[in-house]
Amino acid sequence: MQHTFALIKPDAVQRNLIGAIINMIEKNDFYISAMKMLQMNRQQAEGFYSVHRERPFFNELVDYMISGPIVSLILTGENAVTRYRELMGATNPQNAQEGTIRKSFAISLMENAVHGSDSDENAIIEINYFFNAFERIR
């Protein structure tokens, strides 16, 4: 079994899509090992997206991510990183396939409902960024 990190973004939380997204996750044979809702501050969002610091969209991304609450999750399952990325769909919802989270719920390239780790290594980093050892179910 493998773990991956998932995040339901502010636009999806504000549109009351948490339950619908979790339903899709669970129907695709993921086990939710940990979950919490939080409001990121600017420092937390800048730290989480530090890899994009030099990109022109960085400040807009940070502003968006602190615009409302998020839901962070640890998902567990076979090939969790790859399978969750497939379930999310393409970053740009216009390119996402039917049946994916982003095709179903994304508004735009920025307001694309969810985030997911892009590698095993980043899954560990992102899980550790949001969850301490006491918040995880093995």
Swiss-Prot record:
NCBIfam families: PRK00668.1 (NF001908). GO terms for molecular function: ATP binding; metal ion binding; nucleoside diphosphate kinase activity. This is Nucleoside diphosphate kinase. Its cofactor is Mg(2+). One of its GO terms (cellular component) is cytoplasm. It is found in: Cytoplasm. It comes from the Bacteria. The active site is at H115 (pros-phosphohistidine intermediate). Keywords: ATP-binding, Cytoplasm, Kinase, Magnesium, Metal-binding, Nucleotide metabolism, Nucleotide-binding, Phosphoprotein, Transferase. Its main location: cytoplasm. It comes from Lawsonia intracellularis (strain PHE/MN1-00). Major role in the synthesis of nucleoside triphosphates other than ATP. The ATP gamma phosphate is transferred to the NDP beta phosphate via a ping-pong mechanism, using a phosphorylated active-site intermediate. Homotetramer. Belongs to the NDK family. SUPFAM superfamilies: Nucleoside diphosphate kinase, NDK (SSF54919).
